[in-house]
């Protein structure tokens, strides 16, 4: 699937969740978008660039409680990989990048990155967090020093949780965000 189809598909998924989560015991007012790598890119675009959710009658600021991005590519132009150029319709299209859609009123965000990630360099999260903060949005960045691109998500598995507290940090972010009447994420290590 190419840009923008995967974002349109993602928006349809969020619409379905909003309409159906109650049947499964969930709360339609407590929807968090979470993804790893390309999934983090999609989650960020849906949470930050309102045009995708508006197409299905939703709004990021109203319908998304928070964004959790794990090793996400948020600011990675120009594209060098030929496959990515095909997927995104060219090497230099800023409209495909979450960082270029940041405005005030975005949902609280938790951005997690591995200090040894060589596929999606940690600067993606740092730059995206700085842009979110500059727009007045709540953001927390967690950098796990000795972790690469794949282990950061593998650490969610029960046997690997002792090595990296990814799941514990996600749980704390969700709990704190939902406890706040303003839905403001904790600013443990804000980015200036």
Functional labels for PLM-detected ranges:
Residues 118-127:
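Conserved alpha/beta-hydrolase "acid-adjacent" motif
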Residues 1-5:
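Cap/lid segment of the alpha/beta-hydrolase catalytic domain
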Residues 31, 109, 129, 138-140:
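Hydrophobic anchor at the start of a short beta-strand
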Residues 12-82, 94:
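Primarily recognizes the serine-hydrolase "nucleophile elbow" in alpha/beta-hydrolase
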Residues 86-101, 106-107:
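Active-site nucleophile elbow and catalytic-triad environment of alpha/beta-hydrolase enzymes
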Residues 126, 133-192:
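C-terminal catalytic histidine-bearing segment of alpha/beta-hydrolase fold enzymes
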Residues 105, 111-113, 117:
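Short beta-strand/loop motif that positions the catalytic acidic residue
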Residues 73, 115-118, 146-148:
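Acidic beta-to-alpha connecting loop that harbors the catalytic carboxylate
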